[in-house]
């Protein structure tokens, strides 16, 4: 199949096709190999993980998204109005790929960090509400009281962090559960 023909199939059909190929490969594996494969899946926590539904707002932990591409995928696959919590303090990340998607789906951007200049310059005029906070706890509070009904609060850093995704994800989940 040519790349041109594949491109006309659409993203959903391509993903479905790839899933079918993987399903066929999985059927050919032995049970013990499958158990081992699925046992390792627990290690992929904090990737599009539902945390809680509070006052009509769903909180989603995507702390494992340490790149623009991973965050793009998550935003693309999240329906409804999005309140995006992103990490600042990284002035080297190129967010340009996220701009068209953010324009369509993100209603509020909460920037966590001491220097959020890059996030502001990348999304000013694209996302209607952009605020700065210092901690993930403050970000969760701001999202909860944003006034955006039926929103999905998405914690997706979009940039590498000195702290591990595991630590960031645990902090986010803990703060949500403290609401």
Give the label of every model feature segment:
Residues 3-12, 19-30, 36-179:
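ATP-dependent carboxylate-amine ligase
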């Amino acid at each position: 199949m040519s790349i041109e023909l594949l491109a006309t199939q659409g993203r959903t059909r391509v993903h479905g096709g790839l899933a079918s190929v993987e399903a066929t490969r999985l059927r050919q594996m032995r049970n013990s190999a499958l158990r081992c494969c699925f046992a390792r899946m627990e290690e992929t926590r904090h990737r599009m993980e539902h945390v809680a539904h509070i006052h009509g707002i769903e909180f989603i932990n995507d702390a494992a998204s340490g790149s623009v591409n991973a965050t793009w995928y998550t935003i693309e696959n999240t329906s409804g109005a999005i309140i995006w919590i992103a990490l600042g303090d990284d002035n080297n990340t190129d967010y340009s790929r996220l701009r068209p998607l953010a324009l369509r789906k993100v209603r509020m951007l909460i920037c966590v960090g001491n220097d959020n200049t890059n996030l502001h310059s990348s999304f000013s005029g694209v996302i209607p509400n952009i605020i700065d906070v210092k901690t993930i706890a403050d970000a969760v509070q701001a999202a909860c009281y944003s006034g955006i009904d039926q929103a999905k609060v998405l914690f997706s850093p979009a940039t590498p962090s000195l702290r591990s995704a595991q630590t960031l994800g645990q902090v986010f989940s803990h703060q949500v559960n403290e609401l």
